[in-house]
């Protein structure tokens, strides 16, 4: 706690330009199975919405069988294996959530997704290699540099010691690329700790037991799960002491308020993980004083935060069209 307070206090003083990469590995695999060209020819269909919907569906309702089919399809190029398993999961979920009020919007969307998955062409020519993280790190950075009108040829890049990352960086037109041991480089060490904070926060939010749907062991038994109960982030997130509240305020300034560039964050179509994190920072920072924040019960904060997330999602969905 004290360390992160000091870290963000330093960053707040320095006001650095920060780029966060939050690309989903699940979406990467999905994009390597379904052909984007065939999606673009379907009238009224957004490829971004298509990839987002499949990725979110997998993360919400995945069984071991679906995940196994996804990775086997990527490794063997037998992409019909995944499509067939995905269609089976869609049909089971659609049947299970029918008539549940909180699932009505999702029910309608999954009906459309089921139809599209059946129609879209499978990309049979894709490479079976799916270790993507290295290239994406620098693709997002280059997009941010372009937005800021900074030529990569003027950038001396210093990265942590990791050979694959180093090789990927050399494929871009940076002025220079060198590796540094984080123990001997304050810049790399700051980046490491900042990435660790953001990554752990995103993971903790998405894995919160109060907000997650029940796990799916076998998709055919989904109806045994509690599909009716409204999911809200645990109220424990909002039981803040003054020092916690202050840390959120500083983190908001560093990661959100001072990072107004479009490419400050790199995602593809699926963005929920980073959205719920940024929304939490915005929500807590919307209270100017700790005394104002604690006027509301933690359970009420969970409701307000949920509403804020829904509003942010609706705004993001509008960009699909």
Residue ranges and their predicted role:
Residues 24-321:
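Charge-dense, low-complexity intrinsically disordered regions
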Residues 1-23, 29-33:
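An N-terminal structural lobe/cap that precedes and organizes the functional/catalytic core
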């Amino acid at each position: 706690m004290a360390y992160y307070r000091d870290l963000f206090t330093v960053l707040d003083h320095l006001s650095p330009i920060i780029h966060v990469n939050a690309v989903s590995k699940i979406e990467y695999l999905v994009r390597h199975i379904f052909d984007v060209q065939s999606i673009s020819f379907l009238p009224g269909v957004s490829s971004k919405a298509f990839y987002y919907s499949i990725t979110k569906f997998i993360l919400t309702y995945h069984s071991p069988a679906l995940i196994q089919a996804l990775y086997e399809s990527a490794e063997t190029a037998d992409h019909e294996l995944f499509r067939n398993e995905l269609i089976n999961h869609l049909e089971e979920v659609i049947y299970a959530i029918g008539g549940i009020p909180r699932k009505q919007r999702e029910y309608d969307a999954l009906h459309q997704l089921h139809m599209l998955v059946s129609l879209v062409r499978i990309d049979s020519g894709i490479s079976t290699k799916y270790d993507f993280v290295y290239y994406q790190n620098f693709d997002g950075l280059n997009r941010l540099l372009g937005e800021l009108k900074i030529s990569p040829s003027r950038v001396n890049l210093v990265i942590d010691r990791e050979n694959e990352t180093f090789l990927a960086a050399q494929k871009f037109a940076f002025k220079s690329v060198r590796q540094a041991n984080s123990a001997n480089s304050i810049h790399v060490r700051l980046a490491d700790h900042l990435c660790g904070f953001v990554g752990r926060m995103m993971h903790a939010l998405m894995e919160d037991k109060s907000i997650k749907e029940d796990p799916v062991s076998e998709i055919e038994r989904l109806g045994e799960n509690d599909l009716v109960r409204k999911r809200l982030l645990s109220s424990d997130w909002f039981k803040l002491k003054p020092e916690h509240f202050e840390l959120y305020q500083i983190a908001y300034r560093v990661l959100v308020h001072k990072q107004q560039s479009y490419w400050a964050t790199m995602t593809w179509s699926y963005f929920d993980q980073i959205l719920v994190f940024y929304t939490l920072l915005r929500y807590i920072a919307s209270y100017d004083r700790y005394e104002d924040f604690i006027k509301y019960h933690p359970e009420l904060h969970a409701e307000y935060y949920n509403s804020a997330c829904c509003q942010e999602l609706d705004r993001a969905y509008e960009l699909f069209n």
